[in-house]
């Protein structure tokens, strides 16, 4: 046995063994409980980063643990391969996105295999392959047939930098989630999924996901955004049309004195056309639609608007109300129209004061009545209705229902529910994505591609455009096509591609049968494996991928393809990997390898300038506070890297990178290595202890109890909370206890217990540091693989130690501690406490009034 663990030699050997024996290949097996664990699959960016390493290590530990616990495990890996970054990188590197993507996949696959992750690589998928997106196109056609998808012209979120549309969920604080550039509003023809048809069901089931973090379900609830209220119709003066308005405050209707429409509201252009206001309205809407348009951004802007030249009628007062278009009105909320009540809404109050619009008080607070002329701010509290016709005198809460019922009886309104959630716009004006399988015919309109002709393959001869955008429209060989219905030769294929979040909304189901060619998935395989038992990924996907995946399962359920609705039973959102930034006054942010410590100062190796050590933040290429996993693997190997990722912090917390911590893990691994060598060489003719605790005594008994306590602790920490850090700490304590024990070569009991301990240490660590433990397991005389071993069990009788710790207080203050046999009497404990030399100096010469013995725990002496 070598003196130290040699990962460079050991790890490739065991990886080759696992590969040769297809150790992690998954098949359906009804005789075992199934366990499907999945980490969010990566985008093939070129190489893995420490976030990947941590995420996949967490999953791999759980999977290996579950396999040892007797579960039939599915643990697949694949690639979220379509998307703008690949297209942009291909443009920058003068190559094709496919070539760039597949080369990155090869690189990252090698890196993941080097980490020893227990994936079933036979199930590997890449979403850019036609055999994958064929079934996405097939589902699109099924949804189109059931009116679950539609096309319309609408204002959409447009990123000018990426030259494509973004879904609402892909706009983060009015910036593109990919490039961080401002998002504008642009009117385009777009395809939409009717996710709003499932808004209520998605919302209700947020409370039926006990295995999900509360913050994620809360984020989804807030994004879906259900509001109870009233829809009120305001007639437009001069034309036979109404403006529907959603409001949660029908009690203030009598105080509505003007109307505000979102700049992108379809009525804005219609109402202003031909009026003196037309030019001003056009200038205003153009300017506003090029600004940030989220509710967060609007808080930063001064509230402003323009009169459209049109008027509507308040349905209860019958008074004329001017119709404005205003920058604070949003199409994504309600109907895009706001009945403005300046006396009782601060935003409306400020707007009315700015433009000289009337303010009418309709809710009076207790005490001094409000006068619009002297008000300096809106009154938004509770009160009694005033100047509200027959409803005057009612409390405003009571009036909400009364006014809504009156409107319903008059045919002017109704009780309704509004959702913040909007239908999912999936059209993207980029090349590297799934083609949308429809044809546009001048005679037949929108014609679905025939199923038997699927997939509509993305052409490989596209010349990418330097400024972004899709080249598909310029490819006559792709875009020009005969109509499948009437055979017109001038029909055009749809040249938008699908949002890449469509691919990731069902990939987990495809893993169940990735080579199945008769449908999206083999129904029997999905019935066996789905839903995913444990999903692991970042919280940043709470209202993107995670919401879309829940929606997609409802679509598949509605189409009769599956019998469940929720894709993921449990969700773990792991923390980020963080490190301090290093800033050189000459070079800006620098990499850790470009700095060194000299005389307690951090200096730049390139210029010898003092380096500022900044805050600990998420690792990012832009800040250069990154650790290259390849360099770490070269220096320490996979297992020590894995060990640190698990030991440094609980998985749900951020992990602060610490080079000393990595070295500490290296020392621990080699302590275990030397301990195993010592046990094997010292007790060469003995077998591990297989008896019960009652047959042991003295130090072997203590060590045996400690080992059983450790087994229970590690099992509970992995099973119940994924707190691998405390599980590892427990094993470290057992290792320390073994080093402290007298491993007498002539004492059989101690030898057998020592072998029991070291074998269980290896078993407990095997999901965490698998190569290391495979090697030790083999050295200890076992085979063929530790993966096939059952998880160790503990003896319940061996969890309680024979000794108990007694704390001694004098007048309530801690003065001493001592251990005694658990079987001794309270009287013995009392006498021992009084005789303790540390206690004696606090009671000597004093009158002892009382001695209180709390059984098996504490003695309090009152003097």
Curated annotation (Swiss-Prot):
Annotated InterPro entries: aa-tRNA-synth_I_CS, aa-tRNA-synth_Ia, Leu-tRNA-ligase, Leu_tRNA-synth_edit, M/V/L/I-tRNA-synth_anticd-bd, Methionyl/Leucyl_tRNA_Synth, Rossmann-like_a/b/a_fold, tRNAsynth_Ia_anticodon-bd
UniProt KW Mitochondrion keyword: no
Annotated keywords: Aminoacyl-tRNA synthetase, ATP-binding, Cytoplasm, Ligase, Nucleotide-binding, Protein biosynthesis
Reactions the enzyme catalyzes: tRNA(Leu) + L-leucine + ATP = L-leucyl-tRNA(Leu) + AMP + diphosphate
Disulfide bonds: none
GO MF annotations in UniProt: aminoacyl-tRNA deacylase activity; ATP binding; leucine-tRNA ligase activity
Chain positions of motif 'HIGH' region: 42-52
Residue sites binding ATP per the record: 621
Residue ranges of the motif 'KMSKS' region: 618-622
Predominant place of localization: cytoplasm
EC number(s) recorded for this UniProt protein: 6.1.1.4
EC supergroup of this enzyme: ligase
Family assignment from sequence similarity: Belongs to the class-I aminoacyl-tRNA synthetase family.
Protein name in UniProt: Leucine--tRNA ligase
Organism: Desulforapulum autotrophicum (strain ATCC 43914 / DSM 3382 / VKM B-1955 / HRM2)
